[in-house]
Design a protein with these regions (language model features):
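Glycine-aromatic-enriched surface loops/turns that form tight recognition elements
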Residues: 2, 8-80, 84-162
């Protein structure tokens, strides 16, 4: 790997080095996004907590994605809050990314994603007027919570890759 980088440096060519997960399922695009080659989805590398430094409720996650699209995060304008089904594709019980920020529980997501952050991620799916669903990444189970709750919750935006 080092010789490849040195050859590229001394040859005058500049090329981005693509970083892949160990199992080659996930590709780090080098622009704060990760592409899942199994599902065709592109994800934020960081969850919203790592990106902004604060926990969010469901309503704030909607506004956060709206701002991402206005700003063209990673030169894309079609980011969305994922469904429960999309979120569960990231959960892999045999993989440990890191510990939940401030807790002793493991986050079961590929280590190509940014470390720490939140384990409870919002989905776009509502449960009545006051609640919404999400996925807990230390168990892989769906949760149901008040849309106003910020307690240790974040989200990870998604889009369909080109």
């Amino acid at each position: 790997m080092i010789s490849l980088v040195l050859v590229l440096l001394f040859s005058g060519r500049v090329e981005a080095v693509t970083n892949w997960s160990v199992d080659k399922r996930f590709k780090d695009n080098g622009d704060k996004t990760i592409t899942d080659t199994k599902t065709g989805l592109m994800w934020m590398k960081e969850d919203s907590y790592l990106h902004s430094g604060h926990w969010v409720n469901w309503f704030e996650s909607i506004q956060f994605v709206k701002k991402m699209n206005e700003d063209g995060f990673a030169d894309q304008y079609d980011w969305q809050i994922p469904s429960v089904e999309q979120l569960t594709t990231l959960y892999e019980a045999d993989k440990i990314n890191s510990k939940v920020l401030g807790r002793g529980m493991n986050i079961h997501i590929d280590s190509i994603f940014s470390k720490e952050g939140g384990a409870s991620l919002w989905s776009i799916e509502e449960n009545g007027y006051h609640n919404a669903f999400g996925v807990i990444f230390n168990t892989g189970k769906r949760f149901n919570s008040s849309k106003k709750s910020r307690f240790r919750k974040s989200f990870r935006a998604v889009r369909y890759s080109n």
